[in-house]
Amino acid sequence: MAMLVDPPNGIRQEGKHYYTMWQTLFEIDTKYVPIKPIGRGAYGVVCSSINSETNERVAIKKIHNVFENRIDALRTLRELKLLRHVRHENVISLKDVMLPTHRYSFRDVYLVYELMDSDLNQIIKSSQSLSDDHCKYFLFQLLRGLKYLHSANILHRDLKPGNLLVNANCDLKICDFGLARTYEQFMTEYVVTRWYRAPELLLCCDNYGTSIDVWSVGCIFAEILGRKPIFPGTECLNQLKLIINVVGSQQDWDLQFIDNQKARRFIKSLPFSKGTHFSHIYPHANPLAIDLLQRMLVFDPTKRISVSDALLHPYMEGLLEPECNPSENVPVSSLEIDENMEGDMIREMMWEEMLHYLPRA
């Protein structure tokens, strides 16, 4: 539980109060009353809280010492900039960002999100049974949120069960946009947790697009159906071997997208595999679910189904409401970030983002 404590240096900053949870100090705005810690990661700790002004339950994420690692600081800045613009019921809402006391020396960042009960990773690992309707509804919402992002010119690039938050009503929201990019931005840094990484990323292809997110969705959907990862590779080459074992060896024309000759030779050197039909891996799944999965987990990204077409697949019949799928453009220029920025400039840009959350006079 959250424990109210005195400020560490004995000096109480105006408008702030202090709590400890899981041996972590939270210096937060007085309108937020913490309840209990609900998650921990490399970034820090997340706690549930109540906004005493609105009575709304929220999640507060403390990112500790954010400038210790420049790449992590860039990820945080990217999430701040993106979530200020996106508005969709299947994308997590950033409700507030607490303004630090010291503009030029703050180290910790506190982000306030809408509160969700769990995430898809926890649900998959639980003993809770999942009906075909559950599977379909989770997939529908994921595709729906992704269609919105893609229509706004945004690739998520790190979709996995742990980044899909779920509440007791089975409502699903996509979160963690630290790796998201617009199409135009050249990308060299690490993308997508290995098990959910598309072949074109594993093969170091430079020219990739929305299909990388579709592959990740396919891996997630397979994991929902089978309650375990479909391609749990130990490293990149092993990951490719696991994929070929399932989808089968590829013809030359299916490898045209690989712009690296060495990578193409590696794929062609793998032992022949005729593949395994998904209906054999998931014998109890709805045949229409298997058909859609087959269209998402296609090795050649140019032949992979699009998000829009996946939403129109017969498996989704009865769920799609066209008027509920807005196509909105996020201002691309606002998401462009200089990857070579140093800490002081990142700190200043974060401060400017935080100012957008100050109450209007």
UniProtKB/Swiss-Prot annotation:
Q: What name goes with this protein?
A: Mitogen-activated protein kinase 14
Q: GO molecular function: any one?
A: protein serine kinase activity
Catalytic center residues: 158
Q: Which family does it belong to?
A: Belongs to the protein kinase superfamily. CMGC Ser/Thr protein kinase family. MAP kinase subfamily.
Catalytic EC class: transferase
Q: Which residues form the Protein kinase domain?
A: 32-316
Q: Which SUPFAM superfamilies match?
A: Protein kinase-like (PK-like) (SSF56112)
Q: Which domain of life is it from?
A: Eukaryota
Motif (TXY) on chain: 188-190
Q: Where Phosphotyrosine occurs along the chain?
A: 190
- Indicate how activity is controlled: Activated by threonine and tyrosine phosphorylation.
